[in-house]
Amino acid sequence: MYCSTCLFFIYALLCIAYDLRSHSVPLIVHLLFVLPGLIVFGSQLHGALQACVLTTHQVISDTPAEASSAALPLWHPIWTALLPLLPGLLALLISRLSREALGLGDGLFLLIAGLYLQMRSMLLLLLSGILVGFLVSAVLLIHGHIHGRSMRKVCFPWIPCTLPALCAIAFSQFPLL
């Protein structure tokens, strides 16, 4: 678990560094971290499938009254494993539909993060990025208004806006002694 978390933080810090320096993340950085992410995701999906098999076995072996009182649907573990990929897939769709107003690299970052993180951490990452991005946009807009410049075509790197969430995730994964 710690190994996959460390891999994700290395990936995130590399993306932040490249995004700050050149406003883009090289595709090779994304590709280097996809395979380990798929391995982590595969192990999570394997655990979810095992939980489904166990639940199915319990439902089959129990009496009908006990089987109907199951708390969670059979597909719940699989849905829980797949759900963290949704923000990245939506970001890639928005990137495509908006002709990359939202960068392709940002969507890839969220999709690859979904391979490593659970849904709660993904939501924190996404909401942090949106909130900090809003604050940066507001500051840029006010700065442009004060100096009489149009800020209509100004863009800024979004991945560094996720840094507060990355810090929170790091502190939750690696508690201080």
Region annotations inferred by a language model:
Residues 1-177:
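A membrane-topology feature that recognizes alpha-helical transmembrane segments
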